[in-house]
């Protein structure tokens, strides 16, 4: 995705947006569980600008530690892969029991 955007002569300034929750379990016996430790692990990778540990997570590892909803971090990973030399800043994090998910907002810039 990043290569395609950069290949366009008329690309100018482009904003990419990735959405998805952090840890949450949906429609399982564990529904309502949130794993703040795992959420912070993911956010620490974003803050450090280190995508490699996230790309190495297997489906099973994400499912175990982040729940079936934790698979949504793949959207984040796709965005991070499109922005070379990015730096991340976590603006907010909260495990929101009422929404049964770990919620965060992060800013990523080259």
Locate predicted features.
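Flexible, D/E/H-enriched segments
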Residues: 3-10, 29-110
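Short acidic/glycine-rich loop or secondary-structure boundary segments that cap or lie
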Residues: 24-28
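Beta-strand elements within well-structured catalytic alpha/beta cores of enzymes
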Residues: 12-22
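Short, hydrophobic/aromatic alpha-helical segments in well-folded domains
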Residues: 1-4, 18-19
